[in-house]
Amino acid sequence: MRFKWTVIALASAVALAGAAAAFVQPGTTRWLEMQTGESASGGQARALWNAALDLARPPLRLAGDAAISPRVDSPYAVNTFLHQEVEPAKRARQLQMIREAGFTWIRQPFPWYDLEVGAKGDFTDRRNAPAKSAWDKYDNIVTLAEEYGVGIIARLEAPPEWAHQGFADLGTLGPPAEFADYADYAAAVAQRYKGRIRAYQLWNEPNIYPEWGAQAVNPEDYAKMLCLAHARVKAIDPDAIVLAAALAPTVDQSGRDLSDLIFLQRMYTAGAGKCFDVAAAQGYGLFSGPEDRRLSPLGTNVARHTLMRDIMVANGDAGKPIWLAEANWNALPPVNAGIAGYGNFGIVTLEEQARYVPQLYTRARRDWPWVGAIAVWFFKPASDADKNQAVYYFRMLEPDFTPLPLYEALKAMPK
């Protein structure tokens, strides 16, 4: 078997080397970009070499003809932070523009710390006078989403201080001391919005710091928490779609961070396969474009979820979809003026960003039948307070609602 794959590798390398020599001719740069996701000739050459190595690997188990359920009528989704808008009119304006652009889903946080604020079972917000129901803002968000015909993927995460119970040194985003408390919070949200919120995502990126706190990540513990919350949500609303946490694409195995592929397999080994309807991945392009076909456990790109799909099929989950919970390219200013994290997520121009994201939707329809909703990260910040952070430059709108090229491109895209 080893001899067989060696022969294939050598033959592939020879063939692609010849192809590369032929392709580096006038008029072929765009074709190569479409095949490799790289715009520069050096990157294209490396991509061709990596493609040869990919051909030498055993084929992935993708079950492309499997019947997928649940399916979505439209994959167009976007991440929102409507709870950060103080004025209800601004929430309404966001949802109006979201619907006008053809989006049919929002992925919206329902932060635990902002709902069950002071103590277990206490949904009164006393942080400012006068005290009021902590549900008020979220009731408004759900009602507005219904008015504009937009489905909600509710992110359930971010514990209040009381839920850490002596574990606060792990960080504000870390898991609660008692997983049953998280399940109770998920149940409270599901009970209040039964039949109105269509999907719930149980946590986010538990395979990396800081989302699992300042401690070693633990797929087995996350599986326990997931299964507890899944059971509670389904008991209240059997028709709700439950998403597992989106796993961050990483090759790290340091302990505080763990490869998404290893984390997912350990989730399955711990019995989590029965505790979600949809797997979730992050669809960031990072350092290459939307057509990058390279696949390696030791590299990250827009197609990395394909490796997760292989693990799902191997564990008997060919019928479940993957939703891309966050997807985009980082359109940073050309000169770094003190922006923290500059270049950590790659760098593209606003024009490239506006071209790449529509191409991602097109590729998903063409190549990835198991991919459902794709949620662009993100729609709009409430203010420009984070302009010194690289993550700010994933936005589609400025804080004053000025649309950027990505918004206009997606609005114009046939759907």
Predicted region positions:
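Short, acidic/polar
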Residues: 85-99, 179-191, 257-269, 354-363
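Hydrophobic faces of well-ordered beta-strands that scaffold small-molecule active sites
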Residues: 74-80, 106-108, 152-156, 200-202, ...
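Noncatalytic carbohydrate-binding groove/subsite architecture in carbohydrate-active enzymes
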Residues: 179, 183, 217-347, 395-396, ...
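N-terminal Sec-pathway targeting helices
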Residues: 1-14
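Substrate-binding cleft and catalytic face of glycoside hydrolase catalytic domains
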Residues: 101-124, 128-256, 286, 332-334, ...
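N-terminal carbohydrate-binding accessory modules
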Residues: 21-105, 120-122, 128, 143-144, ...
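Conserved, mostly hydrophobic/aromatic
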Residues: 98, 106, 145, 189, ...
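Aromatic-rich peripheral "rim/lid" segments of glycoside hydrolase catalytic domains that contact
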Residues: 5, 17, 26-69, 122, ...
